[in-house]
Amino acid sequence: MLGGSAAFAALAGLILTSMTPIGPASGTEPLPDLVRDAGEDVAVVEVIVADSAELDRLVGTGVDLDHAAHANPDGTITAHAVVSDGEADALRARGFAVGKSLHDEDDTEAVLAERDATIAEAVAANEEFAEAAEAADISDVKIIRADYYTSFGVGYLSVEAKWADGQTNSSQLTIERDSGPGTEIGSGGTQNISRFVDAGVYLYHRGAAVVETRPDTIRITSPSGDTATAKVADWLPIDGDGAFGPNYQSDFITSYLTPTELYDRVKALAAEFPQLAEIVELPYETNGYRRHAQALLGSTTANRVGIDSVAWGHEGGNDLSVAFVDPGAADSPLSVSVTGDDLTVSLATDASGAITSTAAQVVAAINASPAASAIVVAYTYRGSTGNGLVSVGSADLSDGLSAPESVSRDPHPVYAIRIGKTRDGSKPGVLAYAQEHAREWVPPLVTIETAERLLRNYAQDAETKKLVNALDIWIVPSVNPDGGHYSFYDFNSQRKNMTNHCPLTGSADYNARNSWGVDNNRNYDTYSLFDGYDGASTSCTSGTYAGPSELSEPESSNIDWIAGENPNIKFAMNLHSSGNYFMWSPGAYALPGRVSAPRPTLEEESYFWGASSRILSEIKRYRGMSVTPARTGPIADVLYSAAGNSGDLLWYKYGIYAWNFEVGTQFQPPFENENPTGASAHAESQEFANGLVELMRVARDFETDEKRPSSKVVVSASAEPGMVDVMFDTSEAAAVFYTVDGSKPTYASTLYASAGVREGAETITVPAGTRINWFSVDSAGNVEKNYKPDGSGTNFSTTTANAPS
């Protein structure tokens, strides 16, 4: 059963989190620390700020914010913060208005219970069927569906069946077909169907194959010899299928999936479709779902002693125990002994028999003992001098990890599924990746749904076949498997990876275990914290900790490797949650002044907007959900700074058109929702898979675009005497290079730009009668009139900007 000591929903995508003390603002009294220890309950609450400057101040505190930061009619801004009661009090002390609670830990407990119930129900159904099939008169195989349909004149038979032994036996089932009414079964040939396993639970066998004639009846014989027959039904077309045909298959998601289950799904897909897909093990293994065993003895900062095992918890550290004992005699020396897995510290006493050992003395004694230091490391509490007297007590060391043994404790490979008929780098590439942030459970489902659609629709849907034939698609369902497992099994609010970079003089003790890790989406090497940009932290316990250096983490290094080693990748989607945002670069700015990374050109910005419109329209098609214009655009415009994010890496370092989904309105919503427009992981997986598939259509259209743009000059009266206002109008998203001195335009000429943030094209004011020469070029490199800007061509566009009559 999944769960955790601090189960909780709704946490962050590109978010700003801190577990470190924030120093006092102006005033004589120190402010309460903004800090959260393991075991504290957290909730999502509203924080209302006066304006964007106050939002930046809120971000600067390091409080854990989700992506909701929406403007109110009165000009204020409502943000959502993930806080404990103590953190809420600390925000109030800093002058912030903390409002109502939106989500609490019970929400995620309900989500996990829903997942457990779904899995248990499926297991029970399998067991019930297997038990019933033991009867001589009941077949151990049953046919669920047998559908015939055509696509572009080609006939297909799709079959779903359940086998009583399907939970433990991976054998395929063979289907025999007749050739139509009155013909013999077997005369129409055979086809195989394979197991569909989700979250470790067998659901059914499924598959589709081309058939020359429509069968009327099919038969399945199980490995035990039992049989089942069924009539074949016609699969009827439906209206409103968008770009895809009536036979398009979707909805392959039945529950939330842990990282292990995500990888199992893509491995199974690659094994089932070896001609179209392969698994790529990325070069950098994670640190692993593992920790050293720890104990913390004492009750105050001055007398606490931290104990860490030298071995990993699962490799023996969890077997250790420590005891601080009173020797029961006066004038006893401080001593340390080890018997097997038990460490005993006999505390020093004075002439009256009172304990005199301080925390610092106990730490020094343990670390000086060869036997003790071979198995543990001791330290005072968070940099304390350790001058408090130690109390008698004992503890068993624990790594605090609750996942079942099926979750590996070793350094974890990160896997991508690479999909395409041709996967040698010669086709344009698309990259989709999810779960940079551990607690975002819905985005990985979007990647699985997309992979399933691409592979299962290849045979019968012409549009899907075009995509798979034309593109080289990389899908990483979980960038951060360690953090993902920790979020499912231990601390549902976990945002970062699991690597502890905190020194023993800092927050390295057992109480701080839920605040360790690096924010993978702040660890990249483009417009990062280390470059002076805002929205990341140097604190090892901050939710936006950028790491000790750029690309220090294997999780971020893997994404950089994919982009660097595959220059054919031209488009990318980073899937996060939540907030229903759709964003692109620039994603970082420097303070003061919000000086952003370089903005895309007008042509690039226009292309981002145009492609986004297509993608968002397909998302809306599923159930009518619209991502609003206010939540669409560059990250720096619609949200706040996220220094060192992967979108900026892909766009600025590698020239990849890179977007960021923020899926849904909650981070761990119910899987199903009775409200058809409500928060639902299932519905969100479907609607955002629509958008991800549309990105692939955008990529294909980009590659096959050979249409040259056209453009014209629009002249209007100017407020300045003797001057005119000039704008360029293009037939599509295109860059315009122009001159106003009569010279030939080249790529070194002035580039027509935007008027400002989210404003559209600029207006150029020139003297009436100015000769303007120009050409346009679209995102695919098609130049207007086939003009050669760097050659001897003279067929550029030209006009005289005369005052309108």
Where are these regions (language model features)?
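Beta-strand signatures of extracellular beta-sandwich domains
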Residues: 174-176, 735-739
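Extracellular beta-sheet repeat scaffolds used for adhesion and glycan interaction
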Residues: 333, 337-338, 741-767
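Low-complexity "stalk/linker" and mucin-like segments enriched in Ser/Thr/Pro/Ala/Gly
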Residues: 182-197, 329-339, 745-749
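Secretory targeting and sorting signals
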Residues: 1-27
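Short glycine/proline-centered coil/turn motifs in the loop regions
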Residues: 730-732
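M14 metallocarboxypeptidase catalytic domain recognition
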Residues: 27-306, 310-317, 348-725, 756-759, ...
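Ser/Thr/Gly-rich low-complexity blocks that favor extended beta-strand/coil architectures
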Residues: 312-338, 367-372
